[in-house]
Amino acid sequence: MAQKKLTTMLSILSDRFIEKQIPFCLIGAFALGFYGLSRHTVDIDFMVDANYGDPALEILTGSGYTCFQKTELFAQFDSEYDVFGKVDMMFASTDAGREMIRRSVLLDAELIGRVPVVQPTDYIILKLLAIANDKERLPKDEFDISEFFKGYRTFGISEKFEKIDAKRIYRFAEKFGQTGLIQKYMATEK
């Protein structure tokens, strides 16, 4: 039942962001499902252009969420009594982050409606960024990277998305000091 509520809220929030012309995309575990891979999740993760942060916050608070943490880089929301689940919002304040939003694929899913989904290459780059910014995230995010590549090699990725861009991933991995980490999983993608 919790997953159904999250899916419903994803649909509602995505519609409202699109209606207000807020540049955003879905990131995190929900994105994996659109690639044809899956992982259980208890929250919805968005990346939003930082220039549209205030209108995005208004949409969330107007949709029954309370912001319990906000910085220049992200905001976290919870719904009263956890009825709608949690939402994490990353603010894209760099050209690279905004480019990820522009590169996202607008999908029209039967149960969810329209939602822009981050490219798989950018999903990996965001995981590397998370590790670079917070070493305590290493076990969880490295596991996610490992599982992504296992699924990618076994099942492939929906053809709606671009193929993995190894050069792009390595460029960001080097920038984030994560080349050694990503080499473990991308040896065959180089």
Model-derived features with residue positions:
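Compositionally biased terminal segments of proteins
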Residues: 1-190
